[in-house]
Amino acid sequence: MTEATRILLGVNIDHVATLRQARGTRYPDPVKAALDAEEAGADGITVHLREDRRHIQERDVRVLKEVLQTRMNFEMGVTEEMLAFAEEIRPAHSCLVPERREELTTEGGLDVAGQEQRIRDAVRRLAAVGSEVSLFIDPDPRQIEASARVGAPAIELHTGRYADAEDPEEQTRELQRVREGVALGRSLGLIVNAGHGLHYHNVEPVAAIDGINELNIGHAIVAHALFVGFRQAVAEMKALMLAAATKR
């Protein structure tokens, strides 16, 4: 595998915790899911500790930090509570995301351009504890350029509009937006990741984009795991991504 065809898979285990929290039980254990994902080829584990604690809990994050063999990508809102927790936990990677209590899932990208000083301060605090920061943003040139200005080393492009497109023409347009966003981010010296809404039937065109470093995928893998098991679900996704990346 050459550098040009290398692509990483970050497995988001939030929805293993969603199933647990639905009944207030101790199972299924997202930590076990994370370890299974690593054994199946995941390059990292993503968790989002939301303000309302709807799925991942603080204890999950603490345990994962101790047992992961790869690395944790800690998704977090830009709040004092989350910044203080991240400073304590010191995750290898942190991803700043927008967050609203009423949303089912993260619905859009972070408005970096509209709050540059706030984001710059958060990036500095996280970098000071050794965490590589990415910003979850729409594939919008204005937001990509602002991300570079605030000092974030990485961005994660929101692929939701591509994933939700209902007709082929719209999907093609949205894929092109992602492709152009990757090119711009790379030209500015940023590491470019992507994610949101990706599944087994739409991941390949995104994985084939030259310059994408990592895809973060969760819901589709957790759903598929109900039928084939968690390790198999992760392995199948990784295989699709690697096959697509060889076409770059």
UniProtKB/Swiss-Prot annotation:
Protein name per the record: Pyridoxine 5'-phosphate synthase
EC number: 2.6.99.2
GO molecular function, one term: pyridoxine 5'-phosphate synthase activity
GO cellular component, one term: cytosol
Compartment list: Cytoplasm
Catalytic activity, reaction form: 3-amino-2-oxopropyl phosphate + 1-deoxy-D-xylulose 5-phosphate = pyridoxine 5'-phosphate + phosphate + 2 H2O + H(+)
Keywords: Cytoplasm, Pyridoxine biosynthesis, Transferase
Species: Pseudomonas aeruginosa (strain LESB58)
Pathway participation: Cofactor biosynthesis; pyridoxine 5'-phosphate biosynthesis; pyridoxine 5'-phosphate from D-erythrose 4-phosphate: step 5/5
Site (Transition state stabilizer): 156
Residues holding 3-amino-2-oxopropyl phosphate: 12, 23, 197, 218-219
